[in-house]
Protein backbone atom coordinates (compact mmCIF):
# COMPACT_ATOMS: atom_id res chain seq x y z
CA UNK A 1 0.00 0.00 0.00
CA UNK A 2 2.76 2.49 0.95
CA UNK A 3 4.68 1.88 -2.29
CA UNK A 4 1.50 2.41 -4.32
CA UNK A 5 0.70 5.67 -2.51
CA UNK A 6 4.30 6.90 -2.91
CA UNK A 7 4.15 6.39 -6.68
CA UNK A 8 0.73 8.06 -6.82
CA UNK A 9 2.01 11.11 -4.91
CA UNK A 10 5.14 11.31 -7.13
CA UNK A 11 2.82 11.63 -10.14
CA UNK A 12 0.78 14.34 -8.41
CA UNK A 13 3.99 16.16 -7.45
CA UNK A 14 5.17 16.19 -11.07
CA UNK A 15 1.77 17.09 -12.54
CA UNK A 16 1.21 20.06 -10.21
CA UNK A 17 4.89 20.97 -9.68
CA UNK A 18 4.55 20.63 -5.91
CA UNK A 19 7.41 21.46 -3.56
CA UNK A 20 8.51 20.41 -0.09
CA UNK A 21 6.80 23.50 1.33
CA UNK A 22 3.40 22.31 0.02
CA UNK A 23 1.07 21.02 2.75
CA UNK A 24 -0.69 17.69 2.46
CA UNK A 25 -3.82 17.25 4.59
CA UNK A 26 -6.03 14.34 5.48
CA UNK A 27 -8.78 13.80 8.00
CA UNK A 28 -7.62 10.50 9.44
CA UNK A 29 -4.92 9.40 11.84
CA UNK A 30 -6.38 5.89 12.05
CA UNK A 31 -4.27 3.40 10.10
CA UNK A 32 -7.34 1.55 8.79
CA UNK A 33 -7.98 4.39 6.33
CA UNK A 34 -6.18 4.43 3.00
CA UNK A 35 -4.91 8.00 3.39
CA UNK A 36 -3.83 8.53 6.99
CA UNK A 37 -1.26 10.92 8.46
CA UNK A 38 1.41 8.29 9.17
CA UNK A 39 1.27 6.71 5.72
CA UNK A 40 1.29 10.10 3.98
CA UNK A 41 4.23 11.33 6.08
CA UNK A 42 6.27 8.20 5.34
CA UNK A 43 5.55 8.46 1.61
CA UNK A 44 6.21 12.21 1.46
CA UNK A 45 9.48 11.84 3.40
CA UNK A 46 10.68 9.38 0.73
CA UNK A 47 9.72 11.85 -2.01
CA UNK A 48 10.88 15.17 -0.54
CA UNK A 49 13.84 14.01 1.58
CA UNK A 50 15.17 10.86 -0.13
CA UNK A 51 18.90 11.55 0.11
CA UNK A 52 19.26 11.90 3.85
CA UNK A 53 20.25 8.77 5.76
CA UNK A 54 17.77 7.01 8.00
CA UNK A 55 18.31 7.35 11.73
CA UNK A 56 17.41 4.93 14.49
CA UNK A 57 13.70 4.30 14.56
CA UNK A 58 12.49 5.35 18.00
CA UNK A 59 8.83 5.25 18.99
CA UNK A 60 7.98 4.14 15.45
CA UNK A 61 9.40 7.43 14.14
CA UNK A 62 12.22 7.83 11.67
CA UNK A 63 13.42 11.42 11.45
CA UNK A 64 16.14 12.52 9.03
CA UNK A 65 18.20 15.68 8.63
CA UNK A 66 16.15 18.36 6.82
CA UNK A 67 12.79 16.76 7.72
CA UNK A 68 9.73 18.86 8.47
CA UNK A 69 8.50 18.32 12.05
CA UNK A 70 5.59 19.49 14.19
CA UNK A 71 5.18 19.68 17.95
CA UNK A 72 2.65 17.23 19.35
CA UNK A 73 2.49 18.75 22.85
CA UNK A 74 2.94 22.10 24.57
CA UNK A 75 6.25 22.94 26.27
CA UNK A 76 6.46 25.55 29.03
CA UNK A 77 9.91 24.58 30.36
CA UNK A 78 12.18 27.37 29.06
CA UNK A 79 10.08 30.43 29.84
CA UNK A 80 9.06 30.64 26.18
CA UNK A 81 5.92 28.67 25.54
CA UNK A 82 6.09 26.33 22.55
CA UNK A 83 2.66 25.22 21.38
CA UNK A 84 1.36 21.95 20.09
CA UNK A 85 1.25 22.47 16.31
CA UNK A 86 4.38 24.64 15.96
CA UNK A 87 6.38 23.66 12.90
CA UNK A 88 10.12 23.12 12.70
CA UNK A 89 12.79 21.84 10.34
CA UNK A 90 15.54 19.51 11.52
CA UNK A 91 19.04 20.88 10.87
CA UNK A 92 20.93 17.83 12.11
CA UNK A 93 20.66 14.68 14.16
CA UNK A 94 23.88 13.91 16.01
CA UNK A 95 23.88 10.22 16.90
CA UNK A 96 27.14 10.45 18.89
CA UNK A 97 25.70 13.01 21.33
CA UNK A 98 22.05 11.98 20.90
CA UNK A 99 21.09 15.57 20.01
CA UNK A 100 18.70 17.02 17.47
CA UNK A 101 19.27 20.58 16.22
CA UNK A 102 16.24 22.21 14.65
CA UNK A 103 14.74 25.57 13.75
CA UNK A 104 11.18 26.73 14.40
CA UNK A 105 9.56 27.97 11.20
CA UNK A 106 7.53 30.83 12.71
CA UNK A 107 10.47 32.66 14.33
CA UNK A 108 13.61 31.01 12.85
CA UNK A 109 14.83 30.31 16.38
CA UNK A 110 17.33 27.46 16.58
CA UNK A 111 17.20 24.95 19.40
CA UNK A 112 18.82 21.69 20.43
CA UNK A 113 17.09 18.89 22.25
CA UNK A 114 18.08 15.41 23.34
CA UNK A 115 16.99 12.87 20.78
CA UNK A 116 14.60 10.96 23.06
CA UNK A 117 12.69 14.12 24.04
CA UNK A 118 12.52 15.32 20.42
CA UNK A 119 11.10 11.99 19.28
CA UNK A 120 8.49 12.15 22.06
CA UNK A 121 7.46 15.77 21.42
CA UNK A 122 7.58 15.99 17.61
CA UNK A 123 6.08 14.16 14.64
CA UNK A 124 6.88 14.24 10.93
CA UNK A 125 5.08 17.13 9.27
CA UNK A 126 4.84 16.71 5.53
CA UNK A 127 1.18 15.86 6.13
CA UNK A 128 -1.16 16.64 9.01
CA UNK A 129 -4.85 16.44 9.80
CA UNK A 130 -7.36 19.12 8.85
CA UNK A 131 -7.69 20.10 12.50
CA UNK A 132 -3.93 20.31 13.17
CA UNK A 133 -3.67 22.76 10.24
CA UNK A 134 -6.04 25.31 11.79
CA UNK A 135 -4.56 28.78 12.01
CA UNK A 136 -1.86 28.13 9.42
CA UNK A 137 -1.73 28.77 5.70
CA UNK A 138 0.32 27.49 2.77
CA UNK A 139 0.48 28.37 -0.91
CA UNK A 140 -0.44 24.84 -2.01
CA UNK A 141 -2.78 22.55 -0.10
CA UNK A 142 -3.36 18.96 -1.19
CA UNK A 143 -6.37 17.38 0.52
CA UNK A 144 -6.65 13.60 0.61
CA UNK A 145 -10.03 12.01 1.25
CA UNK A 146 -9.91 8.24 1.75
CA UNK A 147 -12.42 6.16 -0.21
CA UNK A 148 -15.81 5.74 1.50
CA UNK A 149 -14.99 8.24 4.24
CA UNK A 150 -18.53 9.49 4.60
CA UNK A 151 -18.21 10.90 8.13
CA UNK A 152 -16.21 13.99 7.07
CA UNK A 153 -18.47 17.03 7.34
CA UNK A 154 -18.47 20.05 5.05
CA UNK A 155 -17.18 22.37 7.79
CA UNK A 156 -14.06 20.16 8.07
CA UNK A 157 -13.61 20.38 4.28
CA UNK A 158 -13.99 24.17 4.50
CA UNK A 159 -11.37 24.32 7.29
CA UNK A 160 -8.92 22.39 5.12
CA UNK A 161 -9.66 24.47 2.00
CA UNK A 162 -9.26 27.73 3.89
CA UNK A 163 -5.59 26.91 4.57
CA UNK A 164 -4.73 27.42 0.87
CA UNK A 165 -3.30 30.79 -0.20
CA UNK A 166 -2.99 29.95 -3.91
CA UNK A 167 -4.06 26.40 -4.82
CA UNK A 168 -6.22 23.71 -3.27
CA UNK A 169 -6.03 20.25 -4.84
CA UNK A 170 -8.41 17.45 -3.85
CA UNK A 171 -7.42 13.79 -4.09
CA UNK A 172 -10.75 11.98 -3.89
CA UNK A 173 -13.45 10.39 -5.95
CA UNK A 174 -16.18 12.77 -7.08
CA UNK A 175 -18.72 10.76 -5.11
CA UNK A 176 -16.78 10.90 -1.82
CA UNK A 177 -16.09 14.63 -2.14
CA UNK A 178 -19.75 15.32 -2.93
CA UNK A 179 -20.89 13.32 0.14
CA UNK A 180 -18.56 15.38 2.33
CA UNK A 181 -19.88 18.64 0.90
CA UNK A 182 -23.50 17.65 1.50
CA UNK A 183 -23.06 16.58 5.09
CA UNK A 184 -23.17 19.16 7.86
CA UNK A 185 -22.69 19.17 11.60
CA UNK A 186 -26.01 19.22 13.42
CA UNK A 187 -26.74 22.52 15.11
CA UNK A 188 -27.08 21.92 18.82
CA UNK A 189 -28.96 24.51 20.79
CA UNK A 190 -29.15 24.74 24.54
CA UNK A 191 -32.00 27.23 24.26
CA UNK A 192 -35.08 25.90 26.00
CA UNK A 193 -38.51 26.58 24.61
CA UNK A 194 -41.36 27.38 27.02
PLM regions and their residue ranges:
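Conserved helicase motor core of P-loop NTPases
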Residues: 1-83, 89-91
Amino acid sequence: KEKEITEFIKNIKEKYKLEKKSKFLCYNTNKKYYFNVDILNNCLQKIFNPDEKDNDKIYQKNFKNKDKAIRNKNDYSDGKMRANGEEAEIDSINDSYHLVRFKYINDNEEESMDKKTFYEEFDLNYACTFHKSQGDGWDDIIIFISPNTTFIKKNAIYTAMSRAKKRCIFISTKEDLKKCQLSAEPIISTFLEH
